[in-house]
C-alpha cells in the first residue's frame, strides 16, 4: 500500500454542501458493500454494521461531508454504471484506473473484489486521512497494492499531475464536480485531461448532482444554491475544454436514480457522464 501525503498549495475549506448529517441512522448495509466487507475484508457478518458505523463516525468528526454523514460511500455507484463492465474488463487486462475524489477508496475495492489487479488502480483525494481510513474500513492495509496520492487537483503543478500525467486510461469521479463553480470546473477538467492517456478510447466517467434547469434552480434557491451545473452547462464546459486544448472528445450522459435525492421541486438529479478521447 502507498499513501503519499501532499500539502495543497492553496488552502481549501470544506464545501458549503457540508450539512449536519450526524444523526443519520444506518440500519443495514446493503449489497454489494456487504459482500465486499464480508468476503473481501473478512469481517464477520454480525460485526459489519457496527464496524461501518465506527469508521463513519471517526471520518465524519474530521470531514463532515454529507456523503460521509449519510453513509453514501456504501452505495458503490461505479457498479451501477453501464460503463462498469467495460471498465472492469479494461483494468483486468492491464489498463490503469484513477478514482479522483476517492474518499475511502471504496470504488477501488469494488474493482479488486470483482477481479481487477490492485496495482493497476490509483486513488486521489484532498484528504489523505480519508484514504488511510479506507484501510481500516476494508482491513486491507497489508494486501492492497493500489497507490493513493493526496492532492489538490486545482493546482496545475501537483504531484498527481507531475507523476501520472498521460498515464491513466480511465478516470472515475463521483460526487465531485458539483462542488465547484464553472471557472474551477474548467481548470479541473483540463487538469484531469492531462492525466488521461492520449490513446483514443481513454475515458473520464462518473456522476454528480445537477439541476434539470440551472436558471430555474437559481431563481428558486438564490444564495442557497448548492450545485452549479445542468446538462447544457456541463456539455458547454467540455466543448470549451475541446477548444482550449485542441482535443476531440465524445460526450455521453445519462441519469441514475439515487437515494440521496428526492423530488423537492427544483429538479435536482444524478447526472452521469462519460468523456472519451476520439
Curated annotation (Swiss-Prot):
Its EC number is 2.1.1.-. GO terms for molecular function: methyltransferase activity. The keyword Nucleotide-binding does not apply. S-adenosyl-L-methionine binds at residues 125-126, 152-154. It catalyses: chermesin D + S-adenosyl-L-methionine = chermesin D methyl ester + S-adenosyl-L-homocysteine; asnovolin I + S-adenosyl-L-methionine = asnovolin K + S-adenosyl-L-homocysteine. Disruption phenotype: Completely abolishes the production of both novofumigatonin and asnovolin A, but accumulates the tetracyclic intermediate asnovolin I. One of its GO terms (biological process) is novofumigatonin biosynthetic process. Pathway: Secondary metabolite biosynthesis; terpenoid biosynthesis. SUPFAM superfamilies: S-adenosyl-L-methionine-dependent methyltransferases. Keywords: Methyltransferase, S-adenosyl-L-methionine, Transferase. It is an enzyme of class 2 (transferase). Belongs to the class I-like SAM-binding methyltransferase superfamily. Homodimer. Methyltransferase; part of the gene cluster that mediates the biosynthesis of novofumigatonin, a heavily oxygenated meroterpenoid containing a unique orthoester moiety. The first step of the pathway is the synthesis of 3,5-dimethylorsellinic acid (DMOA) by the polyketide synthase nvfA via condensation of one acetyl-CoA starter unit with 3 malonyl-CoA units and 2 methylations. DMOA is then converted to farnesyl-DMOA by the farnesyltransferase nvfB. This is Asnovolin E/Chermesin D methyltransferase nvfJ. It comes from Aspergillus novofumigatus (strain IBT 16806). The gene is nvfJ.
